[in-house]
């Protein structure tokens, strides 16, 4: 179990963990179970930064969390925007997403996300980052449960066929937050609705999900929960 958690941590982060296993193809299907636990780590870093009154420390923790955990999700978010918003065929959209070139949709909405996130980082309840980071990772598990892979290869396809028990285990791992009942229910509801809608959009646009869509969903749900918790 510990080795699977460490593999999960290394898989959805940039942490230089060298985990050697002989049965990776079997283990990789189990990694989504531990995604919410990774979220607790990310949330802790953002929490410490948001809690600090020192601007230099705030920036340090923000860079730390974003570089090691959220930067490649941000890349997926940008690629997904450019692909989904392109008025073309499924094949062309997948090609745009795989190239990774930054288009106008990615520039606009990516900048908007950064501006909103920075303002929330300065003003929102620091604990909300703990919640949003956990549910952001949980949303990737839900998206796998709701969807099918758009391609037969790539990072997203590694998790399919999806093992349903991953959804049960990952849901249980979110229960640590249930003591904050109101925020938990709001976050769970937002995650369920948003992830379901994204799965339908992804199926319509590209025939399923990719690694970019999974990462982009994580970041989008993370930011959306932060915003909603701060507003309500």
From Swiss-Prot:
Q: Which family does it belong to?
A: Belongs to the CobS family.
The record's subcellular location field reads: Cell inner membrane
The coding gene here is cobS
Q: Which InterPro entries match?
A: CobS (IPR003805)
Which keywords accompany this UniProt record? Answer: Cell inner membrane, Cell membrane, Cobalamin biosynthesis, Magnesium, Membrane, Transferase, Transmembrane, Transmembrane helix
Q: Which Pfam families match?
A: CobS (PF02654)
Transmembrane spans? 31-51, 59-79, 102-122, 126-146, 167-187, 209-229
Enzyme Commission number, as recorded: 2.7.8.26
Q: Which HAMAP family match?
A: CobS (MF_00719)
Q: Name one GO molecular function term.
A: cobalamin 5'-phosphate synthase activity
Lineage, highest ranks first: Bacteria, Thermotogati, Thermotogota, Thermotogae, Thermotogales
Q: Which reaction does it catalyse?
A: alpha-ribazole + adenosylcob(III)inamide-GDP = adenosylcob(III)alamin + GMP + H(+); alpha-ribazole 5'-phosphate + adenosylcob(III)inamide-GDP = adenosylcob(III)alamin 5'-phosphate + GMP + H(+)
Name a single GO biological process: cobalamin biosynthetic process
* Major location category of this protein: membrane
Tell me the membrane topology, using the record's own terms. Multi-pass membrane protein
Which cofactor is recorded for it? Mg(2+)
PANTHER family per the record? Answer: ADENOSYLCOBINAMIDE-GDP RIBAZOLETRANSFERASE (PTHR34148:SF1)
Q: In which pathway does it act?
A: Cofactor biosynthesis; adenosylcobalamin biosynthesis; adenosylcobalamin from cob(II)yrinate a,c-diamide: step 7/7
Physiological role: Joins adenosylcobinamide-GDP and alpha-ribazole to generate adenosylcobalamin (Ado-cobalamin). Also synthesizes adenosylcobalamin 5'-phosphate from adenosylcobinamide-GDP and alpha-ribazole 5'-phosphate.
Name it.
Adenosylcobinamide-GDP ribazoletransferase
């Amino acid at each position: 179990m510990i080795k699977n958690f460490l593999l999960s941590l290394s898989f959805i982060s940039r942490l230089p963990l060298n985990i050697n296993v002989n049965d990776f193809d079997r283990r990789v299907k189990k990694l989504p179970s531990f995604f919410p636990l990774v979220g607790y780590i990310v949330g802790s870093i953002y929490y410490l930064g948001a809690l600090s009154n020192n601007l230099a420390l705030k920036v340090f923790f923000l860079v730390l969390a974003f570089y090691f955990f959220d930067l490649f999700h941000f890349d997926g978010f940008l690629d997904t925007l450019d692909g989904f918003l392109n008025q073309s065929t499924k094949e062309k959209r997948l090609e745009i997403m795989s190239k990774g070139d930054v288009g106008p949709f990615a520039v606009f909405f990516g900048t908007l996300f950064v501006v909103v996130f920075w303002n929330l980082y300065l003003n929102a309840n620091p604990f909300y980052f703990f919640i949003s980071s956990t549910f952001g990772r949980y949303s990737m598990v839900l998206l796998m449960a709701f969807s099918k892979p758009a391609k037969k290869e790539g990072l997203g396809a590694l998790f399919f066929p999806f093992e349903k028990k991953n959804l049960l285990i990952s849901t249980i791992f979110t229960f640590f937050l249930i003591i904050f009942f109101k925020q938990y229910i709001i976050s769970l509801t937002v995650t369920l609705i948003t992830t379901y809608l994204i799965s339908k959009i992804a199926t319509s646009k590209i025939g399923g999900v990719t690694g970019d869509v999974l990462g982009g969903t994580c970041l989008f749900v993370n930011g959306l929960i932060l915003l909603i918790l701060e507003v309500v």
